[in-house]
Amino acid sequence: MAEKKIRNLNKKLEVVQKGFANGVATNFPLTEKQKEKMIEKATAAYAKFLEALDCDWQNDPNSADTPRRVAKAYVNDLWAGRYTAMSPITSFPSDGYDGIVIERNIPLTSMCSHHHQTIKGVVHIGYIAGEGGQVIGLSKLNRIVELFGRRGAIQEQLTSAIHNAVDKVTGGNRGVIVTVVATHNCVSCRGVKHDGASMVTTKASGVFRQNTNLARKEFFDSIKINNGGHQI
């Protein structure tokens, strides 16, 4: 029963084609045995990649286990959101609370789909439950960020994915707003090579879409983005 609930929840949240970098694996979710098999295949492939770059990884003591380390990092950490399902989300009656629920500075680790460089930053999430509606367990917002962050990503699409997931699990809400503030290693380590630049993206629905709405102002006043990309 629990496994069915997990599958139904994850099916509800996913909208991207399976197999895409920002989607889930074609046979999602993977069992531990399937993950180990994937790690073995990726290890062999990454070894060939290093050899193509004229890296003698087998005789270099600092690179001898690099192919497997990289494969494990992708499957278990960097792209874990593509392979591991999220647990069921617990919701509770709002008990008449009609204000904003805001969680600020949720840590984000993701990866640029273009160059496979890390994206690091924070996510701010706000929502207002509908009349007689439900609020969700606070840590579930963090888990949603992990689910969609731990895979290949374009920040604009990632912001939409997080917003849409929160919107679905807080059904009947009056509005959802998500702001992502992040730095991209593909900007600082290659190409233009600029350190310190951060990207800010926001997606809003319901009452938060109206610039004159006090709820929108309250959210942005609460997160107070400064030049460093974090709450003041």
Predicted segment positions?
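A domain-level signal for the structural core that forms small-molecule/cofactor-binding pockets
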Residues: A2-I232
